Amino acid sequence: MKSLYVAFGGALGAVSRYVISKFINSSFSFSFVPWGTIFVNVVGSFLLSFLMFLSISKTDISQSFILFFGTGFLGAFTTFSTFAYEFLSIFLTQPLRAIIYFIANIFLGFFAAILGMFLGRGRIL
């Protein structure tokens, strides 16, 4: 049963990532970087960190929900492989732009995860 929670969450997360990323990238086709990938990675980093730190302080969050939403949905919603591919594709022709994309993705993702940790714990420090 646990595998089904992950599978269903993963299916929804993958489709959500595809739709959101395509919408954002087509809305900002003139953009300097692929904002769709940055968006899903940053939002996913925040939500997963928030969920996991909240689950530490609140024992009433079910393991089934964590498997469905954390492991399944957010695991498929975020995408390291697309980030790596896009970075390398950009790097081949525009190395400086690729490095900016890399730094933005990592920095914003970790910032979002730290914010999620603080909010999930319910306190700043």
Swiss-Prot record:
Origin superkingdom: Bacteria
Cited InterPro entries: FluC
Lipid bilayer topology: Multi-pass membrane protein
Documented activity regulation: Na(+) is not transported, but it plays an essential structural role and its presence is essential for fluoride channel function.
GO CC term (a single one): plasma membrane
Main localization (coarse): membrane
Keyword Ion transport appears in the UniProt entry: yes
Keywords tagged on the record: Cell inner membrane, Cell membrane, Ion channel, Ion transport, Membrane, Metal-binding, Sodium, Transmembrane, Transmembrane helix, Transport
Single GO BP term: cellular detoxification of fluoride
Catalytic reaction list: fluoride(in) = fluoride(out)
Keyword Membrane assigned: yes
Places the protein is found: Cell inner membrane
A molecular function GO annotation: fluoride channel activity
Ranges annotated as spanning the membrane: 36-56, 65-85, 99-119
Positions of Na(+) binding: G75, T78
Alphabetical list of HAMAP family matching this protein: FluC
Protein function: Fluoride-specific ion channel. Important for reducing fluoride concentration in the cell, thus reducing its toxicity.
Entry similarity comment: Belongs to the fluoride channel Fluc/FEX (TC 1.A.43) family.
Descriptive protein name: Fluoride-specific ion channel FluC
